[in-house]
């Protein structure tokens, strides 16, 4: 894969351009503020009734309704929730873009699954920091950055990649490294990771471990500590140095037990199911299911949220976290 750094990107590609960042959430605020501090002409596009309007203005940013921001801009970055992007695009973005504009995304979902089909005369790019927005902002203010992905879906002007690299540099990404990919690979790996490991697989593993201990007669408090609370300690080791760092850092007892018992839990049958999950991402079944869920008022999602919030691990966890001074919110 191609990896780019500071010397490979030219901020001059953005200078003199009008830049609209749509959304002011985790990623939106980081992109807008970092680009502003890099000397760019930035406007944030929001609904007039959005609670984020005041926050953005207090941070020194210009704020306009989405349609006005798009009409003014040469480059439009869409950092809105996946499920709202299509409607906003059709009502407020598409009617106000002109030939030669750049349409940018932080995630490839709507382009890859054809929910948004831009006209052929605009550039379509992606700049996706591989960190939450607060870290994108913090590392930038410290003079550093986080790794980013870039991709070009459509290059009408012949300059799309240069624009993507310049944007990545403007938010600090080239100080860490910018990896070139494509919308398909970014979207499919991102969704699979969320479903099979990060949000789906890990949550179910935690609940199954907790339930196993409680059903065997152990106190819920101990089960919580062993299966939920201490997971952060292990994940931090993975994050810092991979699997080897974790194995080096834990006791020999833990290392041996993990290496000999772990494969009994994550079996070939589990991997086979992971492949099915990946197939549903690849062929669009998950995307269609999620879109139908959104259009249907989130009935299934709301039911699942309620079921999860009522799980015993949530109740005992809330009680135990109140004992942890570093977690208690004032």
Curated annotation (Swiss-Prot):
List of residues binding Mg(2+) 2: 190, 226, 230
Cofactor note: Binds 2 magnesium ions per subunit.
The keyword Amino-acid biosynthesis belongs to this UniProt entry's keyword annotation: yes
Active-site residues, record numbering mapped to chain: 107
Pathway(s) where this gene product acts: Amino-acid biosynthesis; L-isoleucine biosynthesis; L-isoleucine from 2-oxobutanoate: step 2/4; Amino-acid biosynthesis; L-valine biosynthesis; L-valine from pyruvate: step 2/4
Record's catalysed reaction(s): (2R)-2,3-dihydroxy-3-methylbutanoate + NADP(+) = (2S)-2-acetolactate + NADPH + H(+); (2R,3R)-2,3-dihydroxy-3-methylpentanoate + NADP(+) = (S)-2-ethyl-2-hydroxy-3-oxobutanoate + NADPH + H(+)
Keywords: Amino-acid biosynthesis, Branched-chain amino acid biosynthesis, Magnesium, Metal-binding, NADP, Oxidoreductase
KW Ligase (keyword) present: no
GO-annotated biological processes: isoleucine biosynthetic process; L-valine biosynthetic process
Necessary cofactors: Mg(2+)
InterPro entries (alphabetical): 6-PGluconate_DH-like_C_sf, KARI, KARI_C, KARI_N, KARI_prok, NAD(P)-bd_dom_sf
Full protein name: Ketol-acid reductoisomerase (NADP(+))
Source organism: Chlorobium luteolum (strain DSM 273 / BCRC 81028 / 2530)
């Amino acid at each position: 894969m191609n990896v780019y750094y500071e010397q490979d990107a030219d901020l001059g590609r953005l200078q003199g351009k009008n830049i609209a960042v749509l959304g002011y959430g985790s990623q939106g605020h980081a992109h807008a503020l970092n680009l502003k501090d890099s000397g760019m002409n930035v406007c944030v596009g929001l609904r007039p009734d959005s609670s984020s309007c005041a926050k953005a203005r207090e941070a020194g940013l210009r704020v306009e309704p989405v349609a006005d921001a798009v009409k003014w801009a040469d480059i439009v970055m869409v950092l809105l929730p996946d499920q709202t992007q299509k409607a906003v695009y059709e009502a407020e973005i598409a009617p106000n873009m002109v030939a030669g504009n750049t349409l940018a995304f932080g995630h490839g979902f709507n382009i890859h699954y054809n929910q948004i089909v831009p006209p052929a005369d605009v550039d379509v790019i992606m700049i996706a920091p591989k960190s939450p927005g607060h870290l994108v902002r913090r590392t930038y203010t410290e003079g550093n950055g986080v790794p980013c992905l870039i991709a070009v879906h459509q290059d009408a002007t012949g300059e799309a990649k240069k624009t993507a690299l310049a944007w990545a540099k403007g938010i600090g990404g080239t100080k860490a490294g910018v990896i070139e990919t494509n919308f398909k690979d970014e979207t499919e790996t991102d969704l699979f990771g969320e479903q099979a490991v990060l949000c789906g697989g890990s949550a179910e593993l935690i609940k199954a471990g907790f339930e196993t201990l409680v059903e065997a007669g152990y106190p819920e408090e101990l089960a919580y500590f062993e299966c939920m609370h201490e997971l952060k300690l292990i994940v931090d080791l993975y994050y810092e140095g991979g699997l080897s760092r974790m194995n080096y850092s834990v006791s020999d007892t833990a290392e041996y037990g993990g290496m000999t018992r772990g494969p009994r839990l994550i079996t070939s049958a589990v991997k086979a199911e992971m492949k099915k999950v990946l197939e549903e991402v690849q062929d669009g079944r998950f995307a269609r299911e999620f879109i139908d869920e959104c259009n249907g008022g989130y009935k299934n999602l709301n039911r699942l949220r309620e079921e999860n919030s009522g799980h015993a691990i949530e109740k005992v966890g809330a009680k135990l976290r109140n004992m942890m001074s570093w977690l208690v919110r004032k």
